[in-house]
Each structure stands twice: as C-alpha cells, then as structure tokens.
C-alpha cells in the first residue's frame, strides 16, 4: 500500500517541499453542472436576473484558485502565474475548465479543482431561482465529474 506523504504517526502535517526543484507546473481540471434547458438558454442569452453568470463564475474561479491554501489545510501557498477559465455551454449543462500555472515546488491540481468547484457553485447560486421546484428543492440540478484532466511538470531552461 502506498504511504501518504502528509501523514506521520497518525498525525497530518504539511509536507516539506523546500528541497524540491522549482519547475513550471500546469494543471487543468474540469467539471459540469446539469441544469434545466431553459436555464441554460437564459445563461446563453444573458437573461439571468442576477447578471452575467459566466463572467461572475470566471471571476469566482480565479479568486478561489488564489485562496486554495485558505480552504484546504495541507495546501502550500504557491506563486500562481496564470489562471485560464473556459466554459462550454451544452443543451442542459455547462462545463467549466480551469487551467492553473505556477513556477514552484509543488503541483497546482488542488488549485485547479478548487477553481472548477467554485465556478460551478457560483453558476448554481446565480440561477437557483430558476432551478427550484415548487417545494424549493433542486431535484435535477447537479454538479458532476469534477476531475483533473492533466497535470504537467516542466524543467525550467535558461534562455
């Protein structure tokens, strides 16, 4: 069985990354929110009462990436050099893709996953009035398949 690097003697701790090489790191994560067709059309046409859903979700994702160490206890504060947030609008869903780049000593996959999660939660928050049923619940709204698409580590070469 593989050992967890952040657990020692049944106690969680932050892994020491000070001896790791500084390299360029990328991670891309993706996830989807399922919505009513009518809600997706309102997002597409810009007809959501709370405002521009995707612009707000993009901003929320970027802020979430930068705040990941405040939310996930064992994440290191690392220099984020780039965040790119893209959305794909389907018939009854919206997919969020977040790519994070850093030059540092540890990966950025948790930052990318956090960005996707908060983007999708923001979309839900902005359209929840259109998604509720007559009891105030969300029987068909769902966030799904949040996962890392790719993680890359590149050696820095002096030019």
Swiss-Prot record:
It catalyses: (8S)-3',8-cyclo-7,8-dihydroguanosine 5'-triphosphate = cyclic pyranopterin phosphate + diphosphate. The active site is at 125. NCBIfam families: moaC (TIGR00581), PRK09364.1 (NF006870), PRK12343.1 (NF008999). Belongs to the MoaC family. Keywords: Lyase, Molybdenum cofactor biosynthesis. GO terms for molecular function: cyclic pyranopterin monophosphate synthase activity. GO terms for biological process: Mo-molybdopterin cofactor biosynthetic process. It is an enzyme of class 4 (lyase). InterPro entries: Mo_CF_biosynth-C_arc, MoaC, MoaC_sf, MoCo_biosynth_MoaA/MoaC, Mopterin_CF_biosynth-C_dom. Substrate binds at residues 74-76, 110-111. It comes from the Archaea. Its EC number is 4.6.1.17. The lineage of its organism: Archaea, Methanobacteriati, Methanobacteriota, Stenosarchaea group, Methanomicrobia. The keyword Lyase applies. Pathway: Cofactor biosynthesis; molybdopterin biosynthesis. Homohexamer; trimer of dimers. It holds the Pfam family MoaC. It comes from Methanococcoides burtonii (strain DSM 6242 / NBRC 107633 / OCM 468 / ACE-M). Catalyzes the conversion of (8S)-3',8-cyclo-7,8-dihydroguanosine 5'-triphosphate to cyclic pyranopterin monophosphate (cPMP). This is Probable cyclic pyranopterin monophosphate synthase.
